[in-house]
C-alpha cells in the first residue's frame, strides 16, 4: 500500500514536471542569445535555485551521476539548438521519440514490457505526430532533434539508476552544476543575453523545479512508463502556443492532443 502511494506520487511528479517543462519555449524566445548562451543560463540559474537545498546533500559523484549530467547537458543543448534551427513542433516531435528508444533499453535493464505500455505508446506517438505536424527535410535542426531524443532516452535510464542511491536534490545539483560549469568559460568570453529576468525564470520554472520533480518520480515509476507520462509536455507546449503566442490549433491537432492525453491516462492507470 505504501509503495502504491509512492508510485502514484512519482507518476504525478513526472506529469507535473512535464507540464512545467512545456513552458520552456516562452522563456527561450524571450531570453535571446545563441544556443550555448541560453543553455548556460538555463543550467546556471537552475543550479542557483536548487543550491540552498543541496548544501547538506552534495556527496561525491559516481559514474552514474557524471554520465547523467553529460547526457542531460546534451539533451538540453541539442533541444535548444533544434528549437532555434527548425520548427518548434518538429523539434518537440523528435525529442519525444524518446519513449521508442527507452523500451529496448528498459528490456536490457530487466523490465518486462507491460501491456499498458504497448497500448499507450503508439497512441501517444500517433497523437504527437498529429498534433505537431512534422516536416520531411533533413536539416541541422532535425539532426539536433534526433540527438536530443536519443540522449533524452538515456537520461530516463540513468535517472532510474541514479535514484537507487541518490536523492533528487543531489541528482539535480550535479545535472545543473556540471553542465553550467562546462559552459561558464564560453559564456564569459562569447555569451550574450537579451533579458536577465527571463533568464532567471528559465532557470527556475522549466528547469530547477521540474528537474527535482522528475528525479523524485523516477524512483517509483518504471523506465518504460515514465517517458509516456512525459508526453504531456508537448501537449502543454501546444496549449502555451495557443494561449501565449496566439498560435492556432487545428482539428487534427486537437485530436492528436486528445490521443496523447489518452495514452498518458492508460500509462497512469493501474
Swiss-Prot record:
It is found in: Cell membrane. The keyword Iron does not apply. Keywords: Cell membrane, Membrane, Repeat, Transmembrane, Transmembrane helix, Transport. Disulfide bonds: none annotated. The chain crosses the membrane at residues 12-32, 35-55, 64-84, 88-108, 117-137, 138-158, 171-191, 194-214, 226-246, 248-268. InterPro entries: CO/AA/NH_transpt, EamA_dom. Gene3D superfamilies: 1.10.3730.20. Residues 19-133, 150-269 form the EamA domain. Its main location: membrane. Pfam families: EamA. It comes from the Archaea. The keyword Endoplasmic reticulum does not apply. This is Uncharacterized transporter AF_1552. The lineage of its organism: Archaea, Methanobacteriati, Methanobacteriota, Archaeoglobi, Archaeoglobales.
Amino acid at each position: 500500500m505504501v509503495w502504491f502511494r509512492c508510485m502514484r506520487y512519482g507518476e504525478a511528479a513526472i506529469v507535473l514536471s512535464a507540464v512545467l517543462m512545456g513552458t520552456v519555449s516562452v522563456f527561450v524566445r524571450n531570453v535571446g542569445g545563441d544556443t550555448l548562451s541560453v543553455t548556460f543560463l538555463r543550467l546556471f540559474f537552475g543550479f542557483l535555485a536548487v543550491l540552498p537545498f543541496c548544501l547538506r546533500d552534495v556527496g561525491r559523484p559516481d559514474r552514474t551521476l557524471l554520465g547523467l549530467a553529460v547526457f542531460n547537458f546534451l539533451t538540453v543543448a541539442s533541444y535548444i539548438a533544434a528549437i532555434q534551427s527548425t520548427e518548434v513542433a518538429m523539434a518537440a516531435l523528435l525529442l519525444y521519440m524518446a519513449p521508442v528508444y527507452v523500451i529496448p533499453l528498459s528490456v536490457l535493464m530487466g523490465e518486462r514490457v507491460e501491456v499498458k505500455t504497448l497500448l499507450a505508446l503508439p497512441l501517444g506517438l500517433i497523437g504527437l505526430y498529429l498534433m505537431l505536424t512534422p516536416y520531411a527535410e533533413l536539416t541541422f535542426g532535425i539532426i539536433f532533434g534526433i540527438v536530443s531524443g536519443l540522449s533524452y532516452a538515456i537520461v530516463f535510464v540513468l535517472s532510474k539508476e541514479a535514484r537507487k542511491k541518490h536523492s533528487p536534490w543531489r541528482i539535480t545539483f550535479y545535472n545543473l552544476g556540471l553542465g553550467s560549469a562546462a559552459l561558464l568559460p564560453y559564456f564569459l568570453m562569447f555569451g550574450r543575453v537579451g533579458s536577465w529576468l527571463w533568464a532567471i525564470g528559465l532557470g527556475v520554472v522549466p528547469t530547477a523545479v521540474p528537474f527535482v520533480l522528475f528525479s523524485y518520480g523516477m524512483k517509483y515509476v518504471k523506465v518504460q512508463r515514465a517517458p509516456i507520462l512525459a508526453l504531456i509536455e508537448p501537449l502543454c507546449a501546444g496549449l502555451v502556443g495557443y494561449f501565449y503566442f496566439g498560435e492556432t490549433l487545428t482539428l487534427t491537432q486537437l485530436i492528436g492532443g486528445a490521443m496523447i492525453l489518452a495514452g498518458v491516462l492508460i500509462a497512469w492507470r493501474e
